[in-house]
A protein has these predicted regions:
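Chitinase-like catalytic core of GlcNAc-active glycosidases
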Residues: 1-186
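Long, acidic/polar, low-complexity amphipathic helices and coiled-coil-like
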Residues: 187-193, 197-201
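Active-site clefts of carbohydrate-active enzymes
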Residues: 65, 197-208
Length: 208
């Protein structure tokens, strides 16, 4: 997982607080601590290199608690249809197929209302059921939706990957960074107990 590429396709930046775009922030980018735009798409060069080397190219969907203003995960769940599907999920599938990248890294680092957790699961399942890859970040927990980094794969985050009732929700999880060797082993064991291959579904590493 890396944050350093820039999209060539534009980012949604609704409700960006103008107060943050002051003279200092504009003239000295070291002061620009905030980051707006919830959707970051990999550019064509990034995707091309990834595919040439047998790797996936995935976009990022990022919600955090301190720098997204009025942009929240609830935007993803808008307009639910009578059949229970979500228009935004279909649009994300369309975007990925059009630009030729493989899927999305869902970085939900702000709390999810517990009442919305089942809908969020259904939203992601709708995407993977159409062949688009989803990787979940070890952040919002199940079933209450609060952010609590587990640093391992366990019962608090595994339903975001494999739900006992709904089945597969996403393809993999990327663990938060404060893990140990024992935690990684426990993560692998937990994945196997769910019938998941940890080599393909449980990732850990560093942030660049």
């Amino acid at each position: 997982y890396t944050d350093y590429y820039g999209t060539w396709h534009g980012q949604p930046t609704a409700n960006v607080p103008k107060s943050l775009y002051d003279e200092k922030a504009q003239s000295d980018w070291t002061q620009k601590w905030f980051e707006f735009g919830t959707l970051n798409l990999p550019n064509a060069a990034y995707t091309n290199v990834a595919h040439k080397n047998g790797a996936k190219s995935i976009a990022t969907i990022f919600y955090s608690g301190n720098d997204r203003g009025e942009q929240t995960y609830k935007d993803l769940l808008q307009g639910k249809r009578a059949d229970g599907t979500y228009p935004v999920a279909d649009k994300l599938v369309e975007i990925a197929k059009y630009y030729g990248f493989d899927g999305y890294f869902v970085n939900q680092e702000s709390s999810v209302n517990s009442a919305d957790v089942p809908a969020y699961q259904d939203f992601m399942k709708q995407i993977i059921d159409q062949g688009i890859y989803i990787q979940w970040y070890d952040s919002a927990t199940y079933p209450n939706g609060g952010v609590s980094y587990q640093n391992m794969f366990n019962d608090a985050n595994s339903p975001w990957v494999q739900d006992p009732n709904k089945g597969k929700i996403s393809d993999s999880i990327f663990l938060n960074y404060w893990f140990s060797g024992n935690m990684l082993q426990d993560s692998a064991d937990h994945a196997k107990s769910l019938g998941i291959d940890p080599k393909y579904a449980v990732f850990a590493g560093i942030e660049a």
